[in-house]
């Protein structure tokens, strides 16, 4: 198994500069911190950039989760992340989950669901950086991937906020972070508990990142072919 991990790590190192080079820029803030860049992009192009951004975040989060699992999580413990003690922090959020629910919600709620998910993960991913730094043998490629995702999630939030303003004419929209579950991170757990908690975070974020991607692609489909969006 370690040979496979090493090989995947080698490929990740080789491909990482390429992924950074081809990643879509979505930094809406200027040097003064004002979101003055994205408003000058057309709604269609902005949505395309956001989707490409979300696709890459989803892909890198999946790679990070798989690498972490192979390196640190013994096989008998991999199913425990689905138990009550390791519930996803976004489980209680009013996010549509079934296909029928997703199909029925409005464009506004699709965007609001994406924004809610993005904002709910910004602080937990910052926390994840501090815990991964304590691992003695965490490879740089894992640390770099999680750091990149954490940074790009903030850019994705900025893009979604501007898109909401463009599509829904909600110029006074403000962003708020969901901190309802962050207090559980105040006490540092022992190493095994920390591994399982980090594994849960990565696994849950992987699923939510995929959900963001699906919502955004459905929104794009509704803009182009409203009656044939499955």
Swiss-Prot record:
Pfam families the record matches: Hormone_1 (PF00103)
One GO cellular component term of this record is: extracellular space
Tissue expression notes: Pituitary gland.
From which residue to which does the signal peptide run?
1-23
Biological processes per GO annotation: animal organ development; growth hormone receptor signaling pathway; positive regulation of growth; positive regulation of receptor signaling pathway via JAK-STAT; response to nutrient levels
Kindly list the places in or outside the cell where this protein is found, as annotated in its UniProt entry: Secreted
Q: Which Gene3D superfamilies match?
A: 1.20.1250.10
Please give the residues the UniProt entry marks as glycosylated: 34, 144
Instruction: Note the SS bond partners.
Output: 28-38, 88-204, 221-229
Give GO MF terms, alphabetically.
Answer: growth hormone activity; growth hormone receptor binding
Keywords from UniProt, A to Z, are: Disulfide bond, Glycoprotein, Hormone, Secreted, Signal
Family as reported in the entry's similarity comment: Belongs to the somatotropin/prolactin family.
Q: What is this protein called?
A: Somatolactin
Q: Which organism is it from?
A: Solea senegalensis
């Amino acid at each position: 198994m370690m040979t496979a991990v090493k090989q995947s790590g080698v490929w990740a190192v080789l491909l990482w500069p390429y992924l950074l080079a081809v990643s879509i820029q979505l930094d809406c803030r200027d040097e003064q911190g004002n979101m003055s860049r994205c408003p000058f992009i057309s709604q269609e192009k902005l949505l395309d950039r956001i989707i490409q951004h979300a696709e890459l975040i989803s892909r890198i989060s999946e790679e990070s989760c798989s690498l972490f699992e192979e390196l640190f999580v013994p096989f008998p413990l991999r199913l425990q992340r689905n138990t009550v003690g390791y519930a996803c922090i976004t489980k209680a959020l009013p996010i549509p989950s079934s296909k029928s629910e997703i199909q029925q919600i409005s464009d506004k709620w699709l965007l609001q669901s994406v924004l809610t998910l993005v904002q709910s993960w910004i602080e937990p991913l910052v926390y994840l950086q501090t815990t991964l730094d304590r691992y003695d043998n965490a490879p740089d490629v894992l640390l770099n991937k999680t750091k990149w995702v954490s940074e790009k999630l903030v850019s994705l939030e900025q893009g979604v906020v501007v898109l909401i303003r463009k599509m829904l004419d909600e110029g006074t929209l403000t962003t708020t972070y969901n901190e309802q579950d962050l207090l559980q991170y105040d006490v540092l757990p022992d190493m095994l508990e920390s591994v399982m908690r980090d594994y849960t975070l990565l696994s849950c974020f992987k699923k939510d990142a995929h959900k963001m991607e699906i919502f955004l692609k459905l929104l794009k489909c509704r803009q182009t072919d409203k009656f044939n969006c499955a």
